[in-house]
């Protein structure tokens, strides 16, 4: 069986929809992670209103200037720390982790672990 890139994307989207439906049923605030080959994005979204409460990305000038390359584990760790600090400053301490269908491996795992180190619980 040969998988094309299109099939991988469709499978990832299908996995992400299943997890989002489960998280929405719980009514929990969720930490959504998205990654591309060059950048990492993390958002904390309220489940009821679907509004972004906290956002951090490697596209931000302060973060981008302090990193040599924005698509590696070092950048993911920095995003994890920043998103956790911003969430804790707004009074958000417990979230559900939404990995958007990506494997819990590599940059996604590093982002989650660095957010936990700062004090975000999920």
UniProtKB/Swiss-Prot annotation:
The keyword rRNA-binding applies. InterPro entries: Ribosomal_uL18_bac-type, Ribosomal_uL18_bac/euk. One of its GO terms (molecular function) is 5S rRNA binding. GO terms for cellular component: cytosolic large ribosomal subunit. Transmembrane segments: none annotated. GO terms for biological process: translation. CDD domains: Ribosomal_L18_L5e (cd00432). The keyword Secreted does not apply. Keywords: Ribonucleoprotein, Ribosomal protein, RNA-binding, rRNA-binding. Disulfide bonds: none annotated. NCBIfam families: L18_bact. Part of the 50S ribosomal subunit; part of the 5S rRNA/L5/L18/L25 subcomplex. Contacts the 5S and 23S rRNAs. Belongs to the universal ribosomal protein uL18 family. This is one of the proteins that bind and probably mediate the attachment of the 5S RNA into the large ribosomal subunit, where it forms part of the central protuberance. This is Large ribosomal subunit protein uL18. The gene is rplR.
């Amino acid at each position: 069986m040969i998988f094309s890139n299109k099939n991988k994307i469709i499978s990832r989207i299908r996995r992400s929809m299943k997890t989002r439906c489960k998280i929405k049923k719980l009514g929990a605030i969720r930490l959504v992670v998205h990654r591309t080959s060059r950048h990492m994005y993390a958002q904390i979204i309220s489940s009821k209103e679907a509004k972004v409460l906290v956002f951090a990305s490697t596209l931000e000038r302060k973060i981008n200037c302090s990193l040599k390359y924005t698509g590696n584990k070092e950048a993911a760790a920095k995003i994890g720390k920043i998103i956790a600090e911003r969430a804790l400053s707004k009074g958000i301490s417990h979230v559900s982790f939404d990995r958007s269908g990506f494997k819990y491996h590599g940059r996604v795992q590093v982002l989650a672990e660095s957010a936990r180190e700062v004090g975000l619980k999920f």
